[in-house]
């Protein structure tokens, strides 16, 4: 017994043991996980797809057309609009060009006879009238001095010096007819088409008229009998170079001998296709 007390006293004085032990740390209790809310079956009235009150059902199929129409309006809670679904067509600019002798005037004349709502711009020129041409219909025939005045006043959308004579397109004529909803048709030479492409960019439609072959084109130029031999040589040489500009146009239409109607219909198809486009061309003059 005495031995046990001495051992206990010595053990108590030992530096290896702390005099007192700290109280145990309290571990916070983990809160219970929240219970998920009870699942509910979603109905069509509570899904957010419909109003809180179920719409009335449509009338039976035995109803007449007017009752069925009104019943569908009531079921959908709306009225059906009579406004057009497609946006209205916008006025556009059509540029028709090609080498001399391809029949630009013949194609345009048939378009004038076939289609409504189109204005064919009358070009101003300083050259003399040819037999059968009418001032104000085929061209506005002015003197070179008058034409230069129009240039100074910036009255022309485009102008060029072609074979020693001026040709140009009056701006105001285009603005007036586009404001009335008319499509604009411009008949220009290759040089004028290149200038218009720089001015109008992709806002206009460029159509290149061409003969079925080089041989056919030369024969047409000879058949016109409007130029001297020297001028005819210039026309043919120029036409051969102008055909190389075909890639600068949006469409190519072949006006073959004896098939004018086919060429005109193809041009009309191009116009109809452009009218049906979702993304319209925007024109600012």
Curated annotation (Swiss-Prot):
Residues 91-272 form the Guanylate kinase-like domain. GO terms for molecular function: ATP binding; guanylate kinase activity. It is an enzyme of class 2 (transferase). Residues 1-66 are annotated as: Disordered. Residues 20-36 have a biased composition (Pro residues). It catalyses: GMP + ATP = GDP + ADP. Residues 1-42 form a transit peptide. Pfam families: Guanylate_kin. GO terms for biological process: regulation of developmental growth. Residues 1-19, 40-50 have a biased composition (Low complexity). The active site is at residues 130, 224, 235. It is found in: Plastid, Chloroplast; Mitochondrion. ATP binds at residues 98-105, 255. Its EC number is 2.7.4.8. Disruption phenotype: No visible phenotype under normal growth conditions at the permissive temperature of 30 degrees Celsius, but mutant seedlings develop chlorotic leaves with aberrant chloroplasts under the restrictive temperature of 20 degrees Celsius. Keywords: ATP-binding, Chloroplast, Kinase, Mitochondrion, Nucleotide-binding, Plastid, Transferase, Transit peptide. One of its GO terms (cellular component) is chloroplast. Changing residue 162 to I: In v2; reduces specific activity for GMP 20-fold. Development of chlorotic leaves at the restrictive temperature of 20 degrees Celsius. The keyword ATP-binding applies. Its main location: plastid. Belongs to the guanylate kinase family. Monomer. Essential for recycling GMP and indirectly, cGMP. Essential for chloroplast differentiation at early stage of leaf development. May not be involved in the synthesis and maintenance of the organellar DNA during leaf development. This is Guanylate kinase 2, chloroplastic/mitochondrial. It comes from Oryza sativa subsp. japonica (Rice).
